[in-house]
Amino acid sequence: MAKKPYYITTAIAYTSGKPHIGNTYEIVLADSIARFKRMQGYDVRFQTGTDEHGQKIEIKAGEAGVTPKQFVDNVSGQIKEIWDLMNTSYDKFIRTTDEYHEKQVQKIFKKLHDQGDIYKGYYEGKYCTPCESFFTESQLVDGKCPDCGREVIDAKEEAYFFKLSKYADRLIDYINTHPEFIQPESRKNEMMNNFLLPGLQDLCVSRTSFKWGIPVDFDDKHVVYVWIDALSNYITGLGYDVDGNSDELYKKYWPADLHLIGKDIIRFHTIYLPIMLMALDLPLPKQVFGHPWLLVGDGKMSKSKGNVIYADDLVNYFGVDAVRYFVLHEMPFDNDGSITWELMVERMNSDLANILGNLVNRTISMNNKYFGGVISNPGVNEPVDDDLKAVALAMHEKVDAKMEKLRVADAITEVFTLLRRCNKYIDETEPWKLAKDETKQDRLATVLYNLMEGIRMAAVALAAYLPDTSAKILDMLGTQERDYLKLDQFGLLETGGKVVEKPEILFARVDIKELMEKVEADKAANAQAQSAAAPAEEAETEEGIDIEPKAEITFDDFEKLQFQVGEIIACEAVKKSKKLLCSQVKIGNQVRQIVSGIRKHYSPEEMVGKKVMVVTNLKPATLAGVKSEGMILCAEDADGNLSLMVPEKKMPAGAEIC
């Protein structure tokens, strides 16, 4: 019997830099769903990839001294490495620089133009370069980009526009008649009330202000913008062809069963993408799910805040499956989730090392100790066994129900409910006492069998979320019974075989103090490495500058000032000022907040990680409503350019300058 196809897609990652753990959450979430669908017997195709065109990339490549293609090759490679590190089972990793994709995008653009859905005009408004988006004055927030909060510029350019307005009513009708199309419900309401019902404006779909994009083949002054380029990857990745010569993959898997994207870009994927598909006379994805954000503490991750956490660092500290568990377990269905170092350590020690790891280790060790590792089931049952079996048999239906609604965290909780019940069963049956009674050996074997079978069933279900750990547990039990669809049966663990002689420690406990010392040491080492790798400026003999001398002071006056080395661990722009930055500066074992008028010369991102010279005994002052507890020293040239004064050699934060 042929398997039913299931196509799941994610947003494609923008190749502007290395993805943090918040970006990584989406691919792990999609992977858990794809793995689960395979376990249910579906023929799954899972696609992800990278979005590689745009002005931001053109600028970053120029700053790096490489071509845009060289730049995206490097970043796309980094992204793919992290996706692979996280053990994601994608079937297709598409790049928007792929030749087939680029050719099909040109054909899609031309088709839409030829049928009158794309027309040429002029776009004028407030433009945000990082977001590559135009905004009207009313859309700005405090005069800045409503999406990223950065400064915007006035811009006008010739552009092609896509007639969103032509299809608005049709899309509204579709959403109303397909209640599962946009999920969760809150995202659907947001799209309807904030965008569709007030009326859609036509969409700018080309650019002339940069060249790094797919050329419009009939007007090469223009490049195709992201709304046509990136959004079409979900069909071009299947071999869709505008001329009707689509690959069998497209015919088999389209429309997508699940399109998984972040809540911040849901407008593009529930309005722009569906209308493009309607204009191409193609079916829409069956469901678009806008997942919430994974935060660090109470806020989004940002380099300027110094709170960015990368997946590969977490893997180094905890291991792949532990990181998968953190991000999947801590994400609610429709609200933002949050991780902290303290929470990750708690989950590691309580859930993974104790509830799961210790249970597996104890059970296998007892079977080795009491029965030489041989698995047997004499069937000497008692009433206490019934509840364990009931919890085990109920698990798969509960997991199915949660996964059907994409409540992945809740599904994992159902598996851990069984693991907790197994731990309780040990306390109830006390195998170590049974072992001392020669007349209770068959009962002891039955108890251990029930435990191992409960563990086996939990491990089979965990394969979608912790694939390596699942396989290790099943291997240690020596079982080939790994079929999720058979979890409605208790007692499939084969008898007569043997468990592993020395069970592996699945998850080692972590000491929070030792971990944070390692994290801080790694941060310092990375900052030092980046500083050492920075290209040195060629030494030049320059003409000196003269300044107006100030009144002389005594040595005693000078000695009143205290200078120390400080390390900037976080930095952000002061909202009420265009000149000020607010830095969190580590000095010794304390952190001070210092406001500096250097915003025109350094971005917040550039400041983080720098060692600077600080006057530390100035009386605190308030600048633009923000308290400042010191002064960061800079030098100023004749043109007013500022440069931070930094130690020539590596010095610890807090070192006295004398």
What are these regions (language model features)?
Residues 76-91:
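A glycine-rich helix N-cap at a beta->alpha junction
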Residues 473-557:
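Intrinsic disorder at enzyme termini
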Residues 2-48, 100-104, 148, 154-369, ...:
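Structured secondary-structure scaffolds
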Residues 1-2, 36-43, 64-68, 85, ...:
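Secondary-structure transition/capping motifs at alpha-helix termini
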Residues 533-658:
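Phosphate-backbone binding interfaces of nucleic-acid-interacting proteins
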Residues 115-168, 172:
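Cys/His-rich short segments
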Residues 120, 343-380, 391-499, 615:
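Helix-rich, typically C-terminal accessory recognition domains appended to large enzymatic cores
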